[in-house]
Structure formats: structure tokens, C-alpha cells
């Protein structure tokens, strides 16, 4: 009987997510305490945010990805580059950063806008029409962020 109890405890521990990571539904990828998924659909920033908000992972409502560190930024870039369904030439995708007045805010409401990774000269609000942020992954701006028109249609990464 004690042996069966030990086996049960071992299975429960082995089946639980690793410390610092959470279980994610099929097609979602865990990183630390969140789940991430790449979508190749082309949507405006608001359409992508709404799509992510309608996605649920482990009961949590999703948002466009919020990037709080260099390590998380590299994780998202790697996830993007290794995802099926993303065309090789499509190098930009929405992240959850949007201009609000004179400052930038994450769509999930988090206040972790301490880490930034803007490309050279960005954000520049070109023609005063660039209020949403995308990740740009080619040439000199690899891993960098760019402000873009929110009506541009890009692929996107959701996080829950």
C-alpha cells in the first residue's frame, strides 16, 4: 500500500509543470508563467488584440505579447522563427505595445514597460500615424521594435 502511495506521489510530481513554468493548451508554448502562440493571420493591431483577447489558455484571457526582458524578447523571436505557418519573408509582427498620449502601454495593462528594444531612431511616429508597435526581425534591426500604423495588417503573437 505504501509503495502504491509513493508511486502515486511520483507520478503527480512528474506530471506537474516544471517550477517557474505553466501548463499550456495544445499549440501554445510555455515560457515562465505565460503561454504564447504565433498566429500567421494578417490583422490590424486592434483586430489582433481582440483575437488574442478571445483566446483563452488555462482560463486566462489573452493579449498581444508583452515583453518585459531581453530573455523574453529572444524567446518570442525564436518562437516566431520556428513556428509553422509563418512565411519566411514575413519578418514583422504585432506586439502588445501601444502609444497612449505621450507614453507607451502594454495591452495587458502590465506596468512592466521598463525594458525597451526600439530600433535605431524609433519610435519616430512617422507622419504622426504610428501608435502601435511591432517586432522587426531582419537586417540591422533584428529583434528590434518599430512603431507602425495601427491599421497595418501584420501577423501577431498572443500571450496568456
For every predicted segment, state its role:
Residues 1-160:
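Extracellular, disulfide-bonded carbohydrate-recognition/adhesion ectodomains
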Amino acid at each position: 500500500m505504501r509503495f502504491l502511495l509513493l508511486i502515486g506521489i511520483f507520478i503527480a510530481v512528474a506530471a506537474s509543470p516544471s517550477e517557474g513554468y505553466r501548463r499550456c493548451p495544445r499549440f501554445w508554448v510555455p515560457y515562465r508563467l505565460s503561454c504564447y502562440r504565433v498566429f500567421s493571420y494578417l490583422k490590424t493591431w486592434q483586430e489582433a488584440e481582440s483575437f488574442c483577447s478571445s483566446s483563452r489558455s488555462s482560463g486566462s484571457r489573452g493579449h498581444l505579447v508583452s515583453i518585459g526582458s531581453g530573455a523574453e524578447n529572444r524567446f518570442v523571436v525564436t518562437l516566431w522563427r520556428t513556428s509553422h505557418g509563418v512565411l519566411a519573408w514575413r519578418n514583422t509582427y504585432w506586439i502588445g505595445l501601444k502609444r497612449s498620449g505621450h507614453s507607451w502601454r502594454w495591452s495587458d495593462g502590465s506596468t512592466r514597460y521598463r525594458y525597451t528594444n526600439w530600433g535605431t531612431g524609433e519610435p519616430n511616429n512617422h507622419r504622426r500615424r504610428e501608435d502601435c508597435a511591432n517586432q522587426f526581425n531582419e537586417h540591422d534591426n533584428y529583434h528590434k521594435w518599430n512603431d507602425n500604423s495601427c491599421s497595418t495588417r501584420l501577423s501577431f503573437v498572443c500571450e496568456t
